[in-house]
Amino acid sequence: MCIRDSYYRKTYGEIPLWVLANVLTFGNLSKMFRVFPQSLKSKVSKNFEPLNQHQMEQFLSVLTKYRNVCAHGERLFTYRTVDAIADTPLHKKLSLPQSGNQYEKGKQDLFAVVIAFRYLLPGKDFLEFKRKLIKEIDRVNREVEHISEVELLNKMGFPKNWKNITRYHLN
């Protein structure tokens, strides 16, 4: 970065944000977004329509927590965050179960990460992620005999119809 740093300083007068983003951790990016002025949060969020800045902040917070679980070797599939993502049209379109007015799945669990990815990743990238996730779930089901697929999906917060997530438009 030092050689490139001097190039960017000479060319742009400073290090552009898009260059800096390549060397920041995901947690740093999440924190940086949180302290952006509202106008900048709004501009960034518009690149991920239909998300608003509040939803973007929630997605980044939950994704950061899950990234940390992975990085520190904790158990991923049953992990739940204290933070939750906002209700999205996908929660309703997938007919996720509710308790009162609160969705029981896809808020603080691993399925919340899948929902966030659906909104944040380009369509082609999300389809590749989904394909790999299906393959991994199938592998676990073959290799782990003491837990059924339904039980595994339930522990991760996935509804039975989770694969339908790509059938629906995001807004």
Residue ranges and their predicted role:
Residues 1-5:
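Conserved small/polar residues in nucleotide/adenosyl-binding loops
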